[in-house]
């Protein structure tokens, strides 16, 4: 009956661990770990997706079982795992930047300062975050940041070339080790066939090189800003962690 089962559950001491991931959809995550993981691990696995990623929660009566399964899952998921426990991705960025003494600066367009806001929510960020600029209009990209007017005229504000210049310019402006830029079409209007709503470019510049990644998010403005900020922070995490 249900009553003895409930009594057992009430008196049971459960251990748990959370594995935080980002940049991988829930369906893909389950596909990656379900086949290699055997079913006799005596643990319960729960998946909790959000706009920022997927949290995996492992629960068991035996702590050693959790540790074993955690090691297997983190090995399978690799770089998509950003934390064990409750730390946010911005907490990890600040922690790793402090550990490795890497200073940061950010030039934001479509996210409107959200990335800088998330970083400065973390205590100690003032030691590594040199500053940021919100260059929302084309004129501010040119006049404030120093992006070439020819670059914007030829390729557009939302382009790999503009994101590259933005990242390089902001790094030099603040004399930081790492400069990050983001430019995109948040929506719901402003898109085209060639450049649809949700198209976003993120640039990352160091003294050695500048790289740009292209992302295609959805059609909802608020979601696009959150997802874009998470993608930017994740790339920053990988860079400051020397992964």
Model-derived features: positions:
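Accessory alpha-helical/coil subdomains and C-terminal extensions
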Residues: 1-52, 59-66
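A generic structural signal for well-ordered coil/turn residues at beta-strand boundaries
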Residues: 13-15, 41, 52-54, 129-130, ...
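Beta-strand residues in well-ordered beta-sheet regions across diverse protein folds
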Residues: 57-59, 203
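Short acidic (Asp/Glu) and glycine-rich catalytic loops that position anionic groups and cofactors
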Residues: 10-13, 52-54, 74-75, 145-147
């Amino acid at each position: 009956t249900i009553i003895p089962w409930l009594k057992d559950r009430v008196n049971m001491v459960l251990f748990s661990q959370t594995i935080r991931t980002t940049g991988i959809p829930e369906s893909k995550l389950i596909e990656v770990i379900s086949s290699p993981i055997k079913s006799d691990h005596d643990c319960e696995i729960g998946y909790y997706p959000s706009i920022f990623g997927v949290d995996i929660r492992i629960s068991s009566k035996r702590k050693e079982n959790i540790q074993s399964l955690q090691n297997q899952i983190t090995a399978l998921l690799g770089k998509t795992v950003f934390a064990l426990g409750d730390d946010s991705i911005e907490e990890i960025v600040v922690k790793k930047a402090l550990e490795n003494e890497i200073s940061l600066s950010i030039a934001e367009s479509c996210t409107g300062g959200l990335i800088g806001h998330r970083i400065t929510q973390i205590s100690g960020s003032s030691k590594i975050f040199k500053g940021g600029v919100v260059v929302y209009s084309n004129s501010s990209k040119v006049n404030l940041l120093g992006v070439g007017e020819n670059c914007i005229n030829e390729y557009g504000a939302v382009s790999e070339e503009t994101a590259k210049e933005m990242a390089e310019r902001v790094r030099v402006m603040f004399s930081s080790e790492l400069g990050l830029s983001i430019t995109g079409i948040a929506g719901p209007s402003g898109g085209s066939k060639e450049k649809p709503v949700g198209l976003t470019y993120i640039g990352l510049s160091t003294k050695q090189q500048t790289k740009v990644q292209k992302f295609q998010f959805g059609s909802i403005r608020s979601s696009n800003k959150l997802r874009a900020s998470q993608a930017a922070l994740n790339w920053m995490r990988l860079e400051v962690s020397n992964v």
